[in-house]
């Protein structure tokens, strides 16, 4: 997106929808987060960033957005996305590492993710459902609520994994308010088959193209973007059809 706009990015908003099963392991991780010990809570938008970087950022402008909104660029409604609390933190860590390697996304770069739905009523139900689930996670009797969901080690059957899918639309914007839209689609359960494809692509990237990977001296634990760079994009195009437009 940054190369397409040929300028620093001011922000990127990602919108997702799909169909698939529920992972018992993911549910278990969610309920275990209350035991996570850190100086910052899981709700901190820069949870994975350094103290020095956090001091330079506007925390309030990067907080998770739980509002329902009609998005004119895609003609759909947005709602909170359950994986945004993880994905956005990783992207912000990538942004910091790229800054240190003189490959900045943009000095005022912001990133958010949402679900996209056809109807306001659907967006409202998703928002309400996530709110209830969030209350279950922090409840004193969360252990009892945990029993209502899929057990760790269990997940969707083969038919569900094969018939699942996801679609993502990313809208990048620069300081001149020029926009660029990127659409991705993948067949296969988002949390299983589609994720397995991405893991395999990363493995191939490391095994076959190590000489083309970014030579980064900053970051410690790297993200996909900072560790694999544009080399991984060429592999992703093989399995995830993409379409872009200004």
Question: What function would you assign to each model-found segment?
Answer:
Residues 2, 98, 199-211:
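Short, hydrophobic alpha-helical segments
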Residues 2-152, 156-164, 168, 180:
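Active-site-lining helix/loop region of Rossmann-like oxidoreductase modules
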Residues 168-174, 184:
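Short beta-strand elements
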Residues 185-202:
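Low-complexity, glycine/alanine/valine/leucine- and proline-rich hydrophobic stretches
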Residues 235-242:
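Conserved small/polar residues in nucleotide/adenosyl-binding loops
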């Amino acid at each position: 997106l940054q190369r397409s706009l040929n300028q620093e990015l001011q922000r990127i908003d990602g919108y997702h929808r799909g169909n698939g099963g529920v992972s018992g392991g993911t549910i278990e991780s969610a309920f275990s987060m209350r035991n996570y010990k850190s100086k910052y809570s899981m709700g901190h938008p820069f949870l994975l960033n350094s103290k020095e970087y956090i001091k330079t950022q506007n925390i309030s402008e990067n907080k998770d957005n739980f509002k329902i909104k009609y998005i004119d660029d895609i003609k759909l409604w947005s709602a909170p996305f359950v994986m945004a609390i993880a994905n956005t933190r990783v992207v912000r860590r990538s942004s910091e590492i790229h800054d240190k390697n003189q490959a900045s996304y943009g000095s005022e770069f912001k990133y958010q993710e949402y679900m996209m739905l056809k109807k306001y009523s659907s967006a409202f139900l998703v928002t309400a459902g996530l709110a209830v689930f969030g209350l279950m996670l922090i409840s004193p009797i969360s252990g009892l609520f945990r029993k209502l969901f899929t057990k760790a080690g269990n997940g969707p059957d083969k038919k569900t994994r094969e018939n699942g899918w996801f679609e993502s639309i990313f809208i990048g914007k620069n300081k001149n308010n020029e926009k660029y839209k990127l659409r991705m689609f993948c067949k296969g359960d988002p949390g299983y088959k589609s994720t397995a494809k991405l893991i395999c692509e990363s493995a191939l990237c490391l095994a076959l193209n190590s000489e083309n990977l970014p030579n980064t001296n900053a970051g410690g634990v790297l993200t996909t973007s900072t560790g694999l760079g544009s080399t991984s994009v060429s592999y992703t195009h093989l399995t995830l059809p993409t379409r872009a437009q200004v």
